[in-house]
Amino acid sequence: MPKKSFQRAERISVQIHRDLGALVQAAVRDHGLPSMSVSDVEVTRDMAHAKVFVTALQAERSFEAVAGLKALARELRMQLAHTMRLRFVPELHFHYDDSLDRGERINTLLRDLIPPADAEKDECG
């Protein structure tokens, strides 16, 4: 029985991710929020809460983006209730997904470690 519940939570996560992505884009346009996208959604097993991870295109405005979505959470949840066929839509909790920022920092560090090809040729002779 628990396996069925997990599969349902996963299906609902995917559906919320898809539907909320469109709603977030509309909120960006309508409310002047920084440009962002939904990167992941995790729904609890009891379907009461959903962690929504968002990525802002401008990392320096990430706090503003998440704060704007938190202010609109109730409205977004009501809009989801109209599009989804659920008796109860999970409460939305927005979090900034910094994985892209961390990945970019790692790429920068790796690029700095690799010596330029011209410098290697000069050293070899």
Swiss-Prot record:
Record's keyword terms, sorted: Cytoplasm, Ribosome biogenesis
Gene Ontology CC entries for this record: cytosol
Localization terms from the record: Cytoplasm
SUPFAM superfamilies listed in its UniProt record: Ribosome-binding factor A, RbfA
Origin superkingdom: Bacteria
Keyword Cytoplasm: yes
Main location, first listed in the record: cytoplasm
GO biological process terms, semicolon-separated: maturation of SSU-rRNA
InterPro entries: KH_dom-like_a/b (IPR015946), RbfA (IPR000238), RbfA_dom_sf (IPR023799), Ribosome-bd_factorA_CS (IPR020053)
PROSITE patterns registered for this protein in UniProt: RBFA
A Pfam family this chain is assigned to: RBFA
Keyword Cytoplasm: yes
Any one Gene Ontology molecular-function term assigned to this protein's record: ribosomal small subunit binding
Function: One of several proteins that assist in the late maturation steps of the functional core of the 30S ribosomal subunit. Associates with free 30S ribosomal subunits (but not with 30S subunits that are part of 70S ribosomes or polysomes). Required for efficient processing of 16S rRNA. May interact with the 5'-terminal helix region of 16S rRNA.
Assembly mode: Monomer. Binds 30S ribosomal subunits, but not 50S ribosomal subunits or 70S ribosomes.
HAMAP family per UniProt: RbfA
Protein family (similarity comment): Belongs to the RbfA family.
UniProt name for this protein: Ribosome-binding factor A
Organism: Xylella fastidiosa (strain 9a5c)
